[in-house]
Amino acid sequence: MAISALEGLTAAVKGRVVDRGDSGYDEARALYNGMIDKHPAAIVYCVGEADVSAAIGFARERGLRLAVRCGGHNGAGLASVDDGLVLDLSSMNEVTVDPSARMVRVQGGAKLGEVDRATYEHGFAVPAGIISTTGVGGLTLGGGVGHLSRGGA
């Protein structure tokens, strides 16, 4: 995708947009599984819901494939896409604990370690995976195994 085609996207979002012409592109497209070597047209570092909405609209209007990256841990590389748009949610990582309701509110880009730290302060434990850099969005949708996972059949 030409840089001029991305101008509408960079103007529509507050977060940073990294494309193939940027010096940090290879680092920005890297995933947890180093064997995955996908080359998205651009990576959008969303800073809020408005960025997510604008990036999705941009991709839809142009017929671009879309991938959402929280932690980038999916073994098959589903957090990236060749020639499409990657929405990186890592800046949307707020974790709020309501101890009286025994409830946690987590934004899509939060990592498991951030959730563990926030809940631990209130004496809570999260039955989730054990790799602290795993994105909670992917963990929620794809699952994971951790110390508090149910055992047996």
Language-model region placement:
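N-terminal accessory segments
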Residues: 1-151
